[in-house]
Curated annotation (Swiss-Prot):
It comes from the Bacteria. It comes from Alcanivorax borkumensis (strain ATCC 700651 / DSM 11573 / NCIMB 13689 / SK2). This is FMN-dependent NADH:quinone oxidoreductase. The gene is azoR. It catalyses: 2 a quinone + NADH + H(+) = 2 a 1,4-benzosemiquinone + NAD(+); N,N-dimethyl-1,4-phenylenediamine + anthranilate + 2 NAD(+) = 2-(4-dimethylaminophenyl)diazenylbenzoate + 2 NADH + 2 H(+). Binds 1 FMN per subunit. Its EC number is 1.6.5.-, 1.7.1.17. InterPro entries: Flavodoxin_fold, Flavoprotein-like_sf, FMN-dep_NADH:Q_OxRdtase_AzoR1, NADH:quinone_OxRdtase_FMN_depd.
């Protein structure tokens, strides 16, 4: 089993979502001792944000790309290959100011590639990647799940579904900034849920 871990907390392993990710990976490894784990920490190893050069590289034909554009394309394809190689994806997902971390958006922008991970057809967009389980460990300071203020959950579902991955499960730890008692209970419930789903 190949596990791809995506951590997006700006606090690295000190983030609440990262702690939940580590617990999930430990549970998966206990169930699958031979599993290999690929960790991509977007805080310690950030992905460049899109700019004109990077977008141009994606849309320039392979035979016409400069050396710089070839490197940009190769970097993007390497991220996509990590997804293709994974049997299970574990994503740590904080909410910052009602959105996803900017470093996670950069990862998405390098993975969502027309003609590579999705394509447009007469019937609409079609994902090109093989479906696989994704566990999203969502940590929030307040309580937002199921409300109109939660723009993050539908966005992540939309992104993965757009590239062909629809088996996406969320585990929420909310109210983490609403006092120590609330935080401890929320994290305990989240750990219990992720263990039950492993």
């Amino acid at each position: 089993m190949n596990i791809l871990v995506i951590k997006s907390s700006v606090f690295g392993d000190n983030g609440n979502s990262s702690a939940l990710v580590n617990a999930q990976v430990d549970a998966l490894k206990a169930k699958h001792p031979q599993a290999t784990v690929r960790v991509r920490d977007l805080s310690t190893d950030p992905i460049p944000h899109l700019d004109g050069n990077r977008v141009s590289a994606f849309f320039t034909s392979a035979t016409q790309r400069t050396d710089e554009q070839q490197a940009i394309d190769a970097f993007s394809l390497a991220l996509i290959d990590e997804i293709k190689a994974a049997d299970h994806i574990v994503l740590g997902l904080p909410m910052y100011n009602f959105g996803i971390p900017s470093q996670l958006k950069s990862w998405i922008d390098h993975v969502a590639r027309a003609g590579i991970t999705f394509r447009y057809t007469e019937k609409g967009p079609q994902g090109l990647l093989e479906n696989k389980p994704v566990t999203v460990l969502a940590a929030r300071g307040g309580i937002y799940a199921g409300t109109s203020n939660d723009t993050v959950t539908p966005y992540i579902k939309l992104f993965f579904g757009f590239i062909g991955i629809t088996d996406v499960e969320f585990v929420f730890a909310e109210g983490l900034n609403m006092g120590d008692d609330v935080k401890e209970k929320a994290l305990a419930v989240a750990r219990s849920e992720l263990l039950a789903s492993t």
